[in-house]
Amino acid sequence: MAITKDIDAHEHHHHHHAPQTNKYEEALTLYNTHIDDVEIREAVKKIIAEKVHENDNIETKKFLLGSVELTSLHTTDSNESILALVEKVNKFDTEYPNLPHVATICAYPVFTELISQSLEVDGVEIVNVCGNFPSSLSRMEVKVAETSLAVNDGATEIDIVMPVGKFLSEDYEGVCDDIAEMKHACGECPMKVILETGDLGNSSNIKKASILAMYAGADYIKTSTGKEKVSATPEAAYVMCQAIKEYYDKTGIQIGLKPAGGINTVMDALTYYTIVKEILGKKWLTNKWFRLGTSRLTNLLLSEIIGKEVKFF
């Protein structure tokens, strides 16, 4: 990875007179992490005012439908409720053959075997939240075991939560080691790292968390668990997109984005789409690199595409 080369050269050059920093702090120095929250708010306002309307059309809404991670992460989930969700995804293909199916079904790993045995639609990924979601606070052995078992049961993508407390204590090495170990447990499965942006306090922290997560092995960065007071915001997504772009420019490695939590309206979804389009461009506008974690949005998108209220999901 190009970035480590930069860092090694950098360390070699400075080691005799600078206090020894670890390679993670060194990585952060290669990026602009001093970000003004007010500037970000203004930039987002401008995008919403000037650009979102360009994407307010049926084609984009179809694309968004195909980017949805149909999510059920409730304490009340049961085999029955999850099976009902899978059957809707199975039926959707028959009922709306001209519309794209959702990108994934996202659930707790106890349901993975059930989902993988009952899902009949090709190309719908099975996503599990692993590693003691949503707090991430469990022993590493437990987190690794949960992840390996999920993959074994048929999960095709894994969502984990960054250890937020370690990040806020500036234990960047601990953060990266944890993420790297989880990545190892995922094997070939793409891994999304949830930054829990609503708990990070400011744009600079969101930028730092994004960089550390990518550097430690994230294939996607995701805004939120949906379990905290503040979930996804356009401002957080804007900063995350900037980080993804800078990381791509430096390393050539493309990282995906998943806004999730509190995406309640079609306009919310269009806003995230527009931010990605403006900052990252066309290359990210496929359902491989752009995902929306939501449950309630699916019917709203479907209703707008069809032109009447639909409660399919």
Regions found by a protein language model. Name each.
Residues 3-19:
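Histidine-centered metal-binding segments
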Residues 18, 27-31:
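Polar/charged low-complexity regulatory segments
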Residues 18-21, 36:
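Anionic, Ser/Thr-rich low-complexity intrinsically disordered regions
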Residues 46-47:
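N-terminal basic/disordered segments at the start of proteins
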Residues 52-67, 74-100, 110-257, 264-295, ...:
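Alpha/beta enzyme core
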Residues 105-107:
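Short, hydrophobic beta-strand segments that form beta-sheet elements in well-ordered domains
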Residues 299:
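Metal-centered catalytic cores of metalloenzymes
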